[in-house]
């Protein structure tokens, strides 16, 4: 393995890789075509790493033995294409970090639910007295944790972009929450390319490892039939009985792994809704595998607080509940949000469309949505999808304008739901920025 690493991208992944590479004696150069945030520049200066931003100096980059590409950079980017033509190894931060850690990993991926499951697994492990570190696609990068923290387990949320650049990395326990069309712009608009990317989480697993997945998801089950995994399969379902895995019977979650049984009433789960029952099943299987006490699992499931920007109740004003679901960046996530609404809803949506098809939402929108507020630069697809079934549709260009409009259109007992079904990069930095702006606008009403 060469000792000269070039890191492309100066965000969380890039900085974590720089710290870890430096610690392991690499000659490190970091290059970002955009602007590096000041807080990251401080870290680079502190650990004495050479860097550049707002440009790529090719002579320095092509001198690398290995290149770490941040997940935001597509494989088709001209720089990546050139590197591969020159035979220079290009890996992801997840792959690079795994070279320097023997600590077992619980890896969680999926189109939706992965952040909730990651947080829930971490909550269960902590309550169960297990020393685990959580990161990956949320919080600290895997590389930074490997460099700076000592744990017995890592709990990692993994995006398809992070999985695209792996070679040998494997989690001991892999969870695939579901697969619905998402990020298709990065996968030649082919769903099978995106599914293949998600399944990379299991491709290096052996018979000693575990693969937890949603048996109700046709995209997953069809793929598994044609592309079997080597690991031990633990499915979960809310539709059918599962012998070795998890299912629901008489309003109870039932988990059976190697003849050990765990049950819990769904009514006691802190997070309600069908999708959260699935999240709970996935996380409770991990707890069973790690032999956490059953009583601890039950108590932890009941006390879990949920995730910011995911169906987060913000405030009630004039008996109207404002709900922040900014993390819903695709249609499937928004489907779950609308499904869980129990009263008339003013729905704020829009942003960067990732090849969305809105057909699945039509029955729910017809039943529950009284007004739609578009928040995005281009709302044409939304207007044509829902214009015939929702009487009131308004286009806005800022969060404060959208929230004020929602305030005007809502009546006592209604919900105002921000669940955009789109990415956030047209008007906001990211979905967190979008969610924070929503909460601020609600508090300013």
UniProtKB/Swiss-Prot annotation:
Q: Which residues cross the membrane?
A: none
Q: What class of enzyme is it?
A: ligase
Q: Known InterPro entries for this protein?
A: Mur-like_cat_sf, Mur_ligase_C, Mur_ligase_C_dom_sf, Mur_ligase_cen, MurD
| Molecular function terms from GO | ATP binding; UDP-N-acetylmuramoylalanine-D-glutamate ligase activity
This protein's superkingdom?
A: Bacteria
What subcellular locations does the record give?
Cytoplasm
Where is the major localization of this protein? cytoplasm
Keywords from the UniProt entry = ATP-binding, Cell cycle, Cell division, Cell shape, Cell wall biogenesis/degradation, Cytoplasm, Ligase, Nucleotide-binding, Peptidoglycan synthesis
Which residues are recorded as binding ATP? 110-116
Which GO biological-process labels does this protein carry? cell division; cell wall organization; peptidoglycan biosynthetic process; regulation of cell shape
Give the EC number(s) listed in the UniProt record: 6.3.2.9
Keyword Nucleotide-binding found: yes
The cellular component terms of Gene Ontology attached to this UniProt record, alphabetical and capped at eight, are:
cytoplasm
Q: Which reaction does this enzyme catalyse, per its entry?
A: UDP-N-acetyl-alpha-D-muramoyl-L-alanine + D-glutamate + ATP = UDP-N-acetyl-alpha-D-muramoyl-L-alanyl-D-glutamate + ADP + phosphate + H(+)
Q: Which SUPFAM superfamilies match?
A: MurCD N-terminal domain, MurD-like peptide ligases, catalytic domain, MurD-like peptide ligases, peptide-binding domain
UniProt cross-references to Pfam families, sorted A to Z:
Mur_ligase_C (PF02875), Mur_ligase_M (PF08245), MurD-like_N (PF21799), MurD_N (PF21377)
Cite the annotated pathway.
Cell wall biogenesis; peptidoglycan biosynthesis
Please explain the role this protein plays, according to its UniProt record.
Cell wall formation. Catalyzes the addition of glutamate to the nucleotide precursor UDP-N-acetylmuramoyl-L-alanine (UMA).
Matching PANTHER family, A to Z?
Answer: UDP-N-ACETYLMURAMOYLALANINE--D-GLUTAMATE LIGASE
Family listed:
Belongs to the MurCDEF family.
Identify this protein by name.
UDP-N-acetylmuramoylalanine--D-glutamate ligase
